[in-house]
Amino acid sequence: MKTIIFFIACLMLIDVVVESKDGYIIEHRGCKYSCFFGTNSWCNTECTLKKGSSGYCAWPACWCYGLPDNVKIFDSNNNKCGK
């Protein structure tokens, strides 16, 4: 029983360490990467270049899945776009 609990605890720890995030990727000025309908492949490329698992155009900006924690994503509370 202790082995099973230890195994489950290890799996939970691995999930915390390998955690990733989803969101709108931002460029150097803090603005979202703009896109238009039909540019899913472009957004997917941009997301995977930032080590995300995938991405698509959630018009009007690129939404990425599985981004590492060090990649900055858009945060409406700390929006610095154009400022």
Curated annotation (Swiss-Prot):
First and last residue of the signal peptide = 1-20
PROSITE patterns per the record? LCN_CSAB
Show the SUPFAM superfamilies listed in the entry.
Scorpion toxin-like
Keyword set includes Signal? yes
* Cell location: Secreted
UniProt-listed GO biological process terms: defense response to bacterium
One GO cellular component this record assigns the protein to is:
extracellular region
> Which keywords belong to this entry?
Amidation, Antibiotic, Antimicrobial, Disulfide bond, Ion channel impairing toxin, Neurotoxin, Secreted, Signal, Toxin, Voltage-gated sodium channel impairing toxin
Please describe what this protein does.
Inhibits the sodium currents (Nav) in an apparent irreversible manner. Produces small depolarization and induces repetitive firing in squid axons. Is specific for arthropods (crickets, triatomides, crabs and squids), but is non-toxic to mice. Shows antibacterial activity against both Gram-positive and Gram-negative bacteria.
> What's noted about domains in the record?
Has the structural arrangement of an alpha-helix connected to antiparallel beta-sheets by disulfide bonds (CS-alpha/beta).
- What is the recorded name of this protein? Toxin TdNa5
Organism of provenance: Tityus discrepans (Venezuelan scorpion)
